[in-house]
Amino acid sequence: LTYSDKSLIAEVDSDLIRTPVAGDAISDNVKKAVIATEDENFESHKGVVPKAVLRATLGSVAGVGSSSGGSTLTQQLIKQQVVGDAPTFTRKATEIVDALALERGMDKNEILTTYLNVSPFGRNNRGQNIAGVEAAAQGIFGVSAKDLTVPQAAFIAGLPQSPIVYSPYAADGSLKSKENLELGLARAKDVLFNMYRTGALSKKDYETYAQYDLTKDFIAPDGIEK
């Protein structure tokens, strides 16, 4: 809370911490990591990938085959902000129609920037729920989104799949146990491999970054007293 002159009255604990930023304030490392992992055809499709949609729809609604890997970043954005994730044909159809419409109304950079500004990224070092890449960068590594290194970007890009599980921090802001930290670290290595697989990283860089110790970059816990 602030006075009219913008001086601080007090800090208020919020249920969700989010700091929207412009696309040019987000590191290309994050953008490449997200595209490589979540939607490698992002630049070429028009909102949906028909074969992937059919496979995922049959998996999630009818229980046939796999339910993963069918949603583009555009669909994920619609799912997060508009239609939810109920496993019904009606919901999936609405998601597809809205994704196609969104691609006609926004360019790729706008869609990617919006996705990165609203997606959930788990918890920060105070145990607060965070959304958006800027809050994630500040709350996990203590840097701005534009300054994230490749390993840091890979870690953050992997979080939206399962934000609380992969977050390095517990609900009280403390660092998780070594065993539980490994879940997010393994996910980050998967992201790095996807970056290599799709050509975003050379083999040499992939091997170097895969050996990097991300735990030394996590900022110290600063839990909020309840």
Positions of the model-derived regions?
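Short, solvent-exposed loop/turn elements at domain surfaces
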Residues: 8-11, 42-44, 165
